[in-house]
Amino acid sequence: MTDVKIKTISGRVYFVKTAEPFEKYVERMTSFNGYIYASTIIKKPTYIKTDTIESITLIEEHGK
């Protein structure tokens, strides 16, 4: 499992858990045009438009 932090151009911060390795996740998100599922800091589910992503940061990668 990979824990990822996403910051948008508006300054909001979101979190994603994915089964993909971090590098593959970043590659897919930067080449994808649409919405991704994420959670807010209080774990409220939401969707983020990929063209509003400012940064994608690895928090922790399990199971390497």
Positions of predicted regions on the chain:
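N-terminal acidic leader/helix
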Residues: 1-31, 37
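Short, mixed-charge low-complexity intrinsically disordered segments
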Residues: 35-64
